[in-house]
Amino acid sequence: MLKQRIITALVLLPIALGGFFLLEGAFFALFIGAVVSLGAWEWARLAGYEQQFGRVAYAATVAVLMVALYHLPQLAGAVLLLALVWWTLATVLVLTYPESVGYWGGRWRRLGMGLLILLPAWQGLVLLKQWPLANGLIIAVMVLVWGADIGAYFSGKAFGKRKLAPRVSPGKSWEGVYGGLAASLAITLAVGLYRGWSLGALLLALLGAALVVFVSIVGDLTESMFKRQSGIKDSSNLLPGHGGVLDRIDSLTAAIPVFAALLWAAGWGAP
């Protein structure tokens, strides 16, 4: 298993780095769209569609919608706002699982929820790539989320006692959340001090980082909730040793549109 994970990582890493940081404009949107389409193919299975026709049809639908959004940039703000609404709702659904299943258990509803997860993630990345310090922004959100993941892992291993959402993901603890949050805030503080941010800007950045990390946890738990309801361990086996695409990006699909929305609200990329 470890050998498989290493080989897969060595193959995918240069592709991912090249796609994220070397491609621009429509080529970048197409690259991210391909990744999101694979995620859509996996999501259709989480929604209850085992047959390839239904899964491919859903992925194609998501691809068409991404093309439409690319040609309708005036809708970007609405897409980010929709993401904020969705992740607020998703928090409630996770906290009330399994009682909440009655509201989202149907296949069509789950397909619709997939759109609310996948399309804003694509839109957020496309916007970040268009804004000042584009690659730096993409690195920033990834470092925030991955730094929080690392902090949560070690903190949870060392101190984890109180379960965060035992009916959704029994392995996660509140102590892990605190460790992840502390790691992300430490990263943000270090960057702010290095770049000489004002006290006001630093406080806003710390608040924003905390919100992004919280939402990334909700994103992770949301996919876990859908997998648990479907009786599925991994979203697919597309990435040997790593599971599926969604298993690798579940936290980022939530964090990216919220990160972009916060920057938009701060006037970073608004026209």
Curated annotation (Swiss-Prot):
Biological pathway: Phospholipid metabolism; CDP-diacylglycerol biosynthesis; CDP-diacylglycerol from sn-glycerol 3-phosphate: step 3/3
GO biological process: CDP-diacylglycerol biosynthetic process
Location(s) in or outside the cell: Cell inner membrane
EC numbers: 2.7.7.41
Keywords: Cell inner membrane, Cell membrane, Lipid biosynthesis, Lipid metabolism, Membrane, Nucleotidyltransferase, Phospholipid biosynthesis, Phospholipid metabolism, Transferase, Transmembrane, Transmembrane helix
Any one GO cellular component localisation term in the record: plasma membrane
Principal cellular location given in the protein's record: membrane
Pfam family for this entry, one: CTP_transf_1
Taxonomy, superkingdom: Bacteria
UniProt topology in membrane: Multi-pass membrane protein
Transmembrane segments: 12-32, 53-73, 75-95, 111-131, 136-156, 174-194, 199-219, 251-271
Record-level Gene Ontology MF annotations: phosphatidate cytidylyltransferase activity
Top EC class of this enzyme: transferase
PROSITE patterns in UniProt: CDS
Catalytic activity as recorded in UniProt: a 1,2-diacyl-sn-glycero-3-phosphate + CTP + H(+) = a CDP-1,2-diacyl-sn-glycerol + diphosphate
PANTHER family named among the record's database cross-references: PHOSPHATIDATE CYTIDYLYLTRANSFERASE (PTHR46382:SF1)
Family: Belongs to the CDS family.
Protein name as it appears in the record: Phosphatidate cytidylyltransferase
Organism: Pseudomonas aeruginosa (strain ATCC 15692 / DSM 22644 / CIP 104116 / JCM 14847 / LMG 12228 / 1C / PRS 101 / PAO1)
Lineage: Bacteria, Pseudomonadati, Pseudomonadota, Gammaproteobacteria, Pseudomonadales
